Design a protein with these regions (language model features):
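A conserved beta-turn-beta hairpin within the catalytic core of GNAT-like acetyltransferases
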Residues: 24-29, 101
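Conserved N-terminal beta-strand and adjoining loop/helix that marks the start
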Residues: 1-15, 36
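NUDIX/MutT-family hydrolases
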Residues: 83, 92-124
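Active-site-adjacent beta-strand/loop module that shapes the phosphate/pyrophosphate-binding cleft
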Residues: 58, 67-90, 100
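The catalytic Nudix box helix
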Residues: 32-64, 103
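Conserved hydrophobic "DFG−1" position in protein kinase catalytic cores
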Residues: 9-10, 17, 84-86, 101
């Protein structure tokens, strides 16, 4: 099973949503930024690397949510979501065609990649408080 990470980048009660470009697998759907874990890499290190590559930002992980197993027809994935915050930089889409900061109400109008659905539901339900790690 392919290990994939994603980051719920928080800013004032909003999360950063990224739209996959047309012509790419799942093109036009919204997702949380991230990518595949490389061999020998921890999920946390993979997320920090992917967010720097995809958005040009340095981040810090502040918590975790429940992993999601999904199959888009190309083999199963295990999507490992983390909460994080921006340490330096401003997000710019290097691999997506649009970025949008969304709150719980506005994220409902976006069409999300299916594996992100359970993550969104957990975030909206507020069931993540016990999963958060304290920030210094």
């Amino acid at each position: 099973m392919v290990q994939v990470v994603c980051g719920l980048i928080e800013d004032g009660g909003r999360l950063l949503a990224c739209r996959r470009p047309p012509g790419k697998h799942l093109g036009g759907l919204w997702e949380f930024p991230g990518g595949k874990v490389e061999p020998g890499e921890s999920p946390e290190a993979a997320l920090i690397r992917e967010l720097q590559e995809e958005l040009g930002i340095e981040t810090e992980i502040t918590g975790a949510l429940s992993p999601v197993e999904w199959d888009y027809g190309r083999g199963p994935i295990r999507l490992i979501p983390f909460f994080c915050r921006i340490v330096t930089g401003t997000p710019h889409p290097h691999e997506h065609d649009e970025l949008e900061w969304v709150d719980a109400a506005t994220c409902a109008r976006l069409t999300w990649a299916a594996a992100d659905g359970p993550i969104l539901a957990e975030w909206k339900a507020g069931d993540v408080a016990t999963s958060r790690t304290p920030t210094p």
